[in-house]
Amino acid sequence: MENNKKLRTWLDDFNLDHPLVIAGPCSAETEKQVLSIAHELKDSDVSIYRAGIWKPRTRPGMFEGVGAIGLKWLQKVKEETGLLTTTEVANANHVKLAIDYDVDVLWIGARSTVSPVSYTHLTLPTKLA
């Protein structure tokens, strides 16, 4: 029950006078790109900077993101702009790495939810307070 109460009120901590805005590139491709966009957004209504560093695909051989190196870029975004950060996670290792790099919000994309087993494994490295 306590988790449910926290989940219903987490937006209150932002003290926003506008809707929560999450923005950033679909794919983090270079450090320069990630930081440039973050600096453009920092003085806007954006509260959370998003960048996909792991890109689940329906077919192999397509661009699957820059991977864990992108987490360092998200850390720099937070340090240089003060924006909170978010990225998509698709497995338990992604979750652990994102937490280790202090990513603020993790999202689970549609391709990761098709398998109940995969979805369950995403929560294994975490324990909600």
How does the language model describe each region?
Residues 1-22:
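N-terminal amphipathic alpha-helix/helix-capping segment at the start of soluble metabolic enzymes
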Residues 20-34, 62, 86-88:
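Active-site mouth loops of central-metabolism enzymes
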Residues 24, 49, 98:
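Conserved, mostly hydrophobic/aromatic
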Residues 45, 97-106:
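Glycine-enriched alpha-helix->loop->beta-strand junction motifs that scaffold or abut catalytic
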Residues 50-68:
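Glycine-rich, proline-tolerant flexible connector loops at the mouths of alpha/beta enzymes
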Residues 64-86, 122:
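Alpha-helix-loop-beta-strand connector modules within alpha/beta enzyme cores
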Residues 84-91, 104-116:
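Catalytic beta/alpha-barrel core
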Residues 120-126:
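Conserved small/polar residues in nucleotide/adenosyl-binding loops
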